[in-house]
Regions:
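Catalytic-core segments of thiol-dependent peptidases
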Residues: 73-83, 97
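Short glycine-rich anion-binding loops that position phosphate/pyrophosphate groups of nucleotides
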Residues: 15-16, 80-85, 127-130
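Structural signal for hydrophobic packing residues in well-ordered secondary-structure cores
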Residues: 45, 65, 69-72, 93, ...
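Flexible glycine/proline-rich
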Residues: 94-149
């Protein structure tokens, strides 16, 4: 019997973020969305890779997404999915592939993104932690289930 491993990459974005274990400065926040999403998807059978924090820069985000797509079967990008001046996720996904949905009638989680790059699903999670968890649960878990996980 062949057993296939599904690899999910998780990319946190945001210039205000610091890694867990660090003390954020004024206006900063500890990055937690990828840890929570990795735990959720890992329980479903995925092998998750959490990448380093990507600052709010479309060039850096593009490089991170290209790497994530090469190394994984599915990619989740945390934050940058809204319509602010530092939210580049949808534009970068569109430049590398296609955005299928941007904005879902789901609360919390409205600004979530569903896209595809090189035939692989890409999900843009909102930055707000409970919205990110909701989007991961409602969008990524069903994809894993459809793949048999």
């Amino acid at each position: 019997m062949d057993v296939r491993e599904v690899r999910v990459g998780l990319i946190p974005t945001g210039s205000e973020l610091v890694p867990a274990g660090s003390l954020p400065g004024s206006g900063g926040a500890v990055e937690s969305n990828t840890a929570v999403s990795a735990a959720l998807l890992g329980e479903a059978g995925a092998t998750c890779t959490r990448y380093g924090i990507v600052r709010d820069d479309p060039v850096l985000l593009r490089e991170a997404i290209e790497r994530g797509i090469r190394e994984n079967d599915m990619l989740l990008i945390s934050a940058g999915s809204s319509a602010g001046t530092r939210d580049f996720t949808a534009a970068v996904i569109a430049g590398l592939g296609e955005v299928l949905v941007h904005g879902i009638a789901m609360k919390p989680g409205l600004p979530a993104i569903v896209g595809r790059i090189d035939g692989k699903p890409v999900i843009g999670l909102p930055g707000y932690p409970i919205a990110a968890l909701t989007a991961a649960r409602e969008l990524a878990l069903p994809l894993l289930a459809a793949w048999g996980f």
